[in-house]
Curated annotation (Swiss-Prot):
Keyword presence, Ribonucleoprotein: yes
Protein name: Large ribosomal subunit protein bL27
Protein's GO biological process: translation
GO MF entries: structural constituent of ribosome
């Protein structure tokens, strides 16, 4: 009598898991209006975390540190001393 000896081998190697492959959604921070641009009151000028840029004349700061125009006018990004920056809105 014939004895069959069948052996099956794995066609694919066992695949391990990876610890990569995740990323958070971008928060779209940064300047929303350019220097010299005309804005109306309430327009968002700069979205930021912390006070990278400080509010100047006719600019308010929101709870999440967003800078917005409190009056209609022209946007100006300015230096405050050696290491600070501010954004102001001057009436047109």
């Amino acid at each position: 009598m014939l004895k069959l000896n069948l052996q099956f081998f794995a066609s694919k190697k066992g695949v391990g898991s990876t610890k990569n492959g995740r990323d958070s959604q971008s928060k779209r921070l940064g300047a929303k209006r350019a220097d010299g641009q005309t804005v109306s009151a309430g327009s968002i000028l700069y979205r930021q975390r912390g006070t990278k840029i400080h509010p100047g004349m006719n600019v308010g700061r929101g709870g999440d540190d967003t800078l917005f125009a409190t009056a209609t006018g022209v946007v100006r990004f300015e230096r405050l001393g050696r290491d600070k920056k501010q954004v102001s809105v001057y009436p047109a």
